[in-house]
C-alpha cells in the first residue's frame, strides 16, 4: 500500500492466463483540516478532513481512511484528530486544532503622569486572564511591551515609566491556560481594536 510520502503498488494475477499486472498507487501528499482555529461560542467544533495524493486526487473518507474526533470539542482547548489509512493506503496521521477564547474590547485609556490607565470589558467565560499590549507604533511593530494579567475578573491596569508627551497605542486580548500533551499551554483570542493615548509630563 501507499503511505504519506511513499508510493505503493498493486499486483494482480490473471486467473485465466496467469500473467501478473502491476499498477502504482500515488503517495499521500497532503492531509489537512478545514480550519485550525475557532473562537469559543459554546458549540461543538468539528473541522472536516481533506486528503490528497501526489497527483492531486482526493481520497475518500470511509474507503481510504477513517477519522476519529475527541469527545467534547466545545470548550477552549487544543484538540487532536486522528486519521487512519486503510485499503490501498497505510499509516496514521494526527492533526490538531484550537478553540480559542472569545476576545474583549478596550473601554478607555486615560493619560497619567508618565503613564496611563487602561480599562477593558470583562470576559470571564472560558478565560484565565488577559494580555495588555502597548506600543509607540500604531501597528505594534516597534517599542512594544506586553503585560500579563493573571485574573479574568481584573478589568484595569496602570502602566508607568513611559515617555512624556509621547503617543502610545494600547490593545488587549484574553487567554486561557489549558493542558495538552501533559503540558500547560496558553491559547489567545485576537487582539482588540487599539486606543491611542498621549502621555502627560
Language model regions located:
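Serine/threonine-rich, repeat-prone extracellular segments and beta-strand-based repeat modules
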Residues: 1-11, 57-90
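Predominantly extracellular/luminal cell-surface or secreted proteins
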Residues: 52, 133-137, 171-177
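Short S/T/G- and acidic-enriched coil/turn segments that sit immediately N-terminal to beta-strands
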Residues: 153-157
Amino acid at each position: 500500500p501507499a503511505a504519506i510520502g511513499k508510493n505503493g503498488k498493486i499486483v494482480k494475477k490473471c486467473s485465466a492466463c496467469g500473467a501478473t499486472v502491476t499498477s502504482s498507487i500515488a503517495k499521500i501528499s497532503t492531509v489537512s483540516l478545514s480550519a485550525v482555529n475557532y473562537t469559543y461560542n459554546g458549540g461543538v467544533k468539528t473541522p472536516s478532513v481533506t486528503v490528497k495524493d501526489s497527483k492531486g486526487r482526493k481520497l475518500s473518507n470511509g474507503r481510504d481512511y477513517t477519522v476519529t474526533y475527541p469527545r467534547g470539542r466545545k470548550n477552549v482547548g487544543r484538540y487532536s484528530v486522528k486519521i487512519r489509512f486503510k485499503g490501498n493506503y497505510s499509516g496514521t496521521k494526527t492533526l490538531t486544532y484550537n478553540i480559542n477564547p472569545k476576545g474583549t474590547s478596550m473601554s478607555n485609556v486615560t493619560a497619567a503622569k508618565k503613564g496611563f490607565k487602561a480599562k477593558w470589558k470583562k470576559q470571564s467565560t472560558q478565560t484565565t486572564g488577559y494580555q495588555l499590549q502597548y506600543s509607540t507604533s500604531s501597528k505594534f511593530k516597534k517599542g512594544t511591551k506586553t503585560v500579563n494579567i493573571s485574573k479574568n475578573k481584573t478589568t484595569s491596569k496602570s502602566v508607568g515609566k513611559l515617555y512624556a508627551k509621547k503617543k502610545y497605542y494600547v490593545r488587549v486580548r484574553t487567554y486561557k491556560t489549558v493542558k495538552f500533551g501533559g503540558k500547560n499551554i496558553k491559547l489567545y483570542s485576537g487582539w482588540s481594536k487599539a486606543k491611542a493615548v498621549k502621555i502627560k509630563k
